[in-house]
Design a protein with these regions (language model features):
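N-terminal membrane topogenic signal
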Residues: 1-4
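Membrane-proximal helix-loop-helix interfaces that form the catalytic/acceptor-binding platform
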Residues: 7, 11-327, 339-506
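A conserved nucleotide-sugar
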Residues: 330
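C-terminal beta-strand-loop-alpha-helix "lid" module of Rossmann-like NAD(P)-dependent dehydrogenases
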Residues: 334-335
Length: 507
C-alpha cells in the first residue's frame, strides 16, 4: 500500500508539474473550440455533422471547466486526472495476470515520459487508456470468477471508450481475443452465453449513438480531403510504437527481445500468444485497412494508447517467465527489477528535456507578432493547420464550432486559403498555399512567414526574407514522441531590403 500511495503521489507530481506552462498546440486549440459547446449544442452540431471524426464525450467532460479562463490549464485537467488514476488502475489490472508484476508495471507507468506527456495534453488519449484498463480489469474479473455482472461493467466502459474516440473500435474488437486467455490451468472455458452477454450489452450501450449518426447522415463527406499522408511501411509503424513507448536503442532492443522470447519461456504458451495477438492484431489490422481502402492518414502510437498497459504487462510477464525458467539466475539477478531500472533511467533522461521545451509555442509566436504587426501586414503559413492556433492567441474565435477559410485556385491551380481579421484596429490577413511568396508582396505589403523546420531551411537558403524569430516546439507528441514542431518566423518586406534578422542555424 505504501508503494502504491508513493507512486500515486510521484505520478501526480510528474503529471502536474509545468502543466499550464506550455502553449496550446494546434490539436489542443481544436479541443478548446470543440469543448465550448454544452451538451445541447454538441448534439445539434453532430446532427448537422454526423461524420465528424471525434465523438462528443471528451468535449462534454472538458466543457465542465468552461469558460476556460486559463485554457492551458483548464482543457488539460481531465487528462491529468485520468493519467493519475491510471497508476493505481494498472496495479490492479496487472495483478489480474500475476501479483509479481503489479508493482513493476505501476512503477514503470509512473515514470513513463510518453504517458506523462499525454496526461498533460488536452486531448482524449489519457482518458482512453484509463477507460480501456478499467474495461479489461472487469473482463479479467469475469474470466477469474465467471460472474456475469462484470461483463456489464466491461460493456459500459467499452461504450465510454466508443463515445470518447472512434479509434477505440480496434481495441474493443481485438480485446475479444482475451476470451482465450486462461488465468488458471483448471479454469473452465468461458461459455458462449458470456460472450453474447458482453456483446449484447456493448451494443445496447452504443446503439443509440450509432442510430443517431446514421439517421443524421445526409451524404456529408466522411474523410477529410486535406489529409494526404501515407501510413508508410508496416515495419516503420511497429518501430515508431516501440520508439515512443520504450525510448532509446537499449530499451527498444530489450523490449523486442522480451516479446519474441515470451512464447518460448512462458509456462502457458497459449496465454503468451493470446497477449501478443491482442497487441499486434490492431496494429497490423489498422495498417492493412489503410492500405486496402487507400486511407490517406498517418498512423501514430497515440492511436494505440489503450494497449500500453497490455504492452507493459507482456514485458514483465516475459521477464517473470524467464526468471521461473532459470531459477539460479534469480538468486543473483532479479531481471524484472533490472529491466525496470533500465526503463526508469531511459525515461528520466527524457523528462528534463520534456519539461524544459515546448510542444509548439504558438503563444510565444503571437506575443511577438502582436508587438511587431502593422496595419495591412499579411501572415503566410506553410499549411492552413496553423490557422486555428494563430487565431486563438489573437483572441479571434470561430462564430460556430470551427473557423471557415475562404479558398480559391491561384494561377498555378494550387488552392489558396485565407482568413482576415482585425487586431487593435489593424487589418490582418492569413494566407496559406503551396506557392509563396512574391504574389503576396506585389502591393508593397509586408509578409510574415510562419514555417516548420524543413520549410524554414528552404526559405533561408532561397528567399530574400529574413529570420525574425524562433519559437520552440522540440517535444511534441505527434507522429512520433518527440517530434520537433518548432516554429520559425520570417519577414519579407519589399520596402526594406536591408532588414536585419537573427543569425541562427536551422538544424
Amino acid at each position: 500500500m505504501f508503494i502504491l500511495l508513493l507512486c500515486l503521489f510521484i505520478g501526480f507530481a510528474l503529471r502536474y508539474y509545468h502543466l499550464d506552462q506550455k502553449s496550446l498546440w494546434m490539436d489542443e486549440v481544436h479541443t478548446y473550440n470543440d469543448s465550448r459547446d454544452g451538451f445541447g449544442d454538441q448534439i445539434k452540431f453532430y446532427k448537422e455533422n454526423p461524420t465528424f471524426l471525434h465523438p462528443p464525450l471528451f468535449f462534454v467532460l472538458t466543457h465542465l471547466f468552461y469558460p476556460f479562463s486559463k485554457p492551458e490549464l483548464d482543457i488539460r485537467i481531465i487528462p491529468l486526472i485520468a493519467g493519475t488514476l491510471s497508476i493505481p488502475m494498472i496495479y490492479l489490472f496487472a495483478r489480474s495476470f500475476a501479483p509479481q508484476i503489479s508493482i513493476p508495471c505501476m512503477v514503470a507507468l509512473t515514470f513513463m515520459a510518453y504517458h506523462i506527456s499525454l496526461s498533460q495534453d488536452g486531448r482524449s488519449y489519457a482518458i482512453l487508456m484509463f477507460f480501456g484498463m478499467v474495461s479489461l480489469y472487469f473482463f479479467m474479473q469475469h474470466l477469474k470468477t465467471s460472474k456475469k455482472k462484470y461483463l456489464i461493467v466491461t460493456a459500459l466502459f467499452y461504450a465510454l471508450l466508443f463515445y470518447t474516440s472512434y479509434s477505440s473500435i480496434p481495441f474493443i474488437l481485438f480485446s475479444q481475443i482475451l476470451w482465450f486467455y486462461k488465468l488458471e490451468d483448471h479454469q473452465k472455458t468461458p461459455s458462449l452465453s458470456s460472450f453474447l452477454i458482453q456483446i449484447a450489452f456493448t451494443l445496447l450501450f452504443i446503439l443509440p449513438w450509432i442510430i443517431f449518426v446514421v439517421s443524421s447522415y445526409k451524404g456529408q463527406i466522411i474523410m477529410d480531403p486535406t489529409h494526404k499522408e501515407d501510413p508508410g511501411p508496416l515495419w516503420s509503424l511497429l518501430y515508431g510504437i516501440l520508439h515512443d513507448w520504450v525510448p532509446f536503442a537499449p530499451l527498444i532492443i530489450a523490449s523486442s527481445a522480451l516479446l519474441i522470447l515470451f512464447p518460448v519461456f512462458a509456462k502457458q504458451r497459449r496465454n503468451s500468444l493470446v497477449l501478443l495477438a491482442v497487441l499486434l492484431s490492431p496494429m497490423v489490422g489498422l495498417w492493412l485497412y489503410c492500405k486496402w481502402f487507400n486511407v490517406t492518414h498517418f498512423i501514430t502510437s497515440r492511436y494505440f494508447i489503450t494497449f500500453v498497459p497490455l504492452f507493459l504487462i507482456s514485458l514483465f510477464l516475459s521477464l517473470l517467465s524467464i526468471e521461473f525458467r532459470f531459477e539460479r539466475i534469480k538468486r543473483y539477478l532479479h531481471l524484472r527489477f533490472l529491466f525496470l531500472f533500465l526503463f526508469i533511467a531511459s525515461n528520466l533522461v527524457i523528462l528534463p528535456l520534456y519539461y524544459r521545451h515546448q510542444k509548439q509555442d504558438n503563444r510565444g509566436l503571437i506575443v511577438y507578432l502582436k508587438e511587431h504587426l502593422r496595419g495591412g501586414d499579411k501572415i503566410f503559413t506553410e499549411t492552413e493547420s496553423y490557422f486555428p492556433a494563430i487565431l486563438h492567441y489573437f483572441g479571434v474565435y470561430p462564430q460556430g464550432r470551427h473557423h471557415v477559410a475562404k479558398s480559391w485556385k491561384d494561377s498555378e491551380n494550387k488552392t489558396v486559403y485565407s482568413i482576415s481579421f482585425v487586431f487593435q484596429n489593424k487589418n490582418i490577413t492569413l494566407f496559406s498555399s503551396k506557392t509563396c511568396c512574391s504574389q503576396y508582396v506585389n502591393d508593397g505589403s509586408r509578409l510574415w512567414i510562419v514555417a516548420g523546420k524543413w520549410t524554414a531551411k528552404r526559405i533561408k537558403e532561397n528567399s530574400p526574407s529574413v529570420l525574425k524569430g524562433y519559437f520552440d516546439g522540440s517535444f511534441l507528441n505527434f507522429t512520433r514522441f518527440p517530434v520537433d514542431a518548432s516554429i520559425y518566423l520570417f519577414l519579407l518586406d519589399p520596402k526594406s531590403p536591408g532588414e536585419k534578422g537573427i543569425d541562427m542555424p536551422i538544424e
